């Protein structure tokens, strides 16, 4: 849900809302915007399936939804969208999660259809965002790709996002959350990819979350957090933390946790119960002006 902020608070923070009814703001050389649209039309679904070389897509794909963060001084753009996320799903190609026999019938589109789950129907993605340096048409260099864009490199680091500092009381200048895709796994659970952003006078922070629950079988949580502190003009750096968690219902039951599905509906409240299987921290140095 987008927030409404007092104009005086925005002004004192050096921020201004985007014009023409756009959702977002400009602050300290950053333009941060969320985009919203409807789910893919049947024609768009066919186009996406062709591009992704698949005959399967989530039930609800919000192809026009996006979060875009652009550093105006360098034309560096960090953005999040469903197509790139699904490209990551297709590339990773995980084996299908085994579904209880009693629930397999739910995946049939026709009563007589045989259920063959030979693909990752959970749409699990390793996606943690897209980034690029957009170059002006007059300044396209040889190292840029044909679109006039140069790629960026994340570096592994020991730095950590200061979550304690983020919990301090500070005015929220802008907050929004967008859904990229969602699938109810034929009423057998949920697969959901969302991204939300929060902008304060001192920094911006975002969370990209893939949440999967295959009822009675598996839970999977893949989260990407990014943080940027304003005022780092000499060496502007974005920190990124990736954390993957996963557990079977059987393993959680063995630890004494309840298996009631109502307990496992909110990933925010249960994340600490799921063991970490991967954790990395990286940084992105914003390049000089192109």
UniProtKB/Swiss-Prot annotation:
Expressed in which tissues: Widely expressed.
Q: Which InterPro entries match?
A: Phosphatase_reg/MetRdx (IPR051330), TIP41-like (IPR007303)
GO CC annotation: cytoplasm; nucleus
Which parts form a coiled-coil structure per UniProt? Answer: none
Q: Tell me, what is an example of a GO biological process annotation in this record? A: TOR signaling
Note one Pfam family from the annotation.
TIP41
Superkingdom classification of source: Eukaryota
Question: Could you share any additional remarks the record makes about this protein?
Answer: Considered as a reference gene in terms of expression stability throughout development.
> What family does the database annotate?
Belongs to the TIP41 family.
Q: What role is this protein assigned? A: May be involved in the regulation of the TOR signaling pathway. Indirectly activates the PP2A phosphatase via interaction with its suppressor TAP46. Could play a role in cytoskeleton functions.
Q: How does it assemble?
A: Interacts with TAP46.
Could you identify this protein by its name?
Answer: TIP41-like protein
């Amino acid at each position: 849900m987008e927030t409404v902020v007092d104009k005086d608070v925005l002004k004192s923070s050096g921020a201004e809302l985007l014009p023409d009814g756009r959702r977002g703001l400009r602050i300290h050389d950053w333009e941060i915007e969320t985009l919203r649209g409807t789910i893919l039309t049947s024609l768009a679904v066919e186009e996406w399936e062709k591009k992704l070389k698949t005959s399967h897509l989530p039930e609800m794909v919000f192809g026009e939804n996006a979060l875009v963060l652009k550093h105006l001084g360098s034309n560096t753009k960090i953005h999040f969208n469903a197509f790139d996320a699904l490209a990551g799903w297709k590339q990773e190609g995980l084996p299908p999660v085994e579904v209880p026999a009693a629930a397999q019938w739910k995946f049939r589109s026709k009563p007589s259809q045989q259920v063959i789950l030979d693909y990752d129907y959970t749409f699990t993605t390793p996606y943690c965002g897209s980034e690029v340096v957009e170059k002006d048409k007059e300044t396209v260099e040889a190292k840029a790709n044909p679109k006039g864009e140069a790629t960026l490199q994340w570096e592994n680091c020991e730095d950590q996002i200061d979550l304690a500092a983020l919990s301090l009381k500070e005015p929220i200048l802008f907050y929004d959350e967008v859904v990229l895709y969602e699938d109810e796994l034929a009423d057998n659970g949920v697969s959901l990819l969302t991204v939300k952003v929060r902008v304060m006078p001192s920094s911006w922070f975002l969370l990209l979350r893939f949440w999967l629950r295959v009822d009675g079988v598996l839970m999977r949580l893949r989260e990407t957090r990014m943080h940027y502190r304003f005022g780092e003009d000499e060496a502007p750096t974005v920190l990124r933390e990736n954390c993957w968690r996963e557990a079977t219902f059987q393993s959680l039951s063995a630890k004494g946790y309840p298996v009631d599905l109502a307990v496992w509906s909110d990933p925010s409240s249960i994340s600490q119960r799921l063991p970490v299987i991967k954790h990395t921290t990286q940084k992105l140095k914003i390049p000089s002006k192109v």
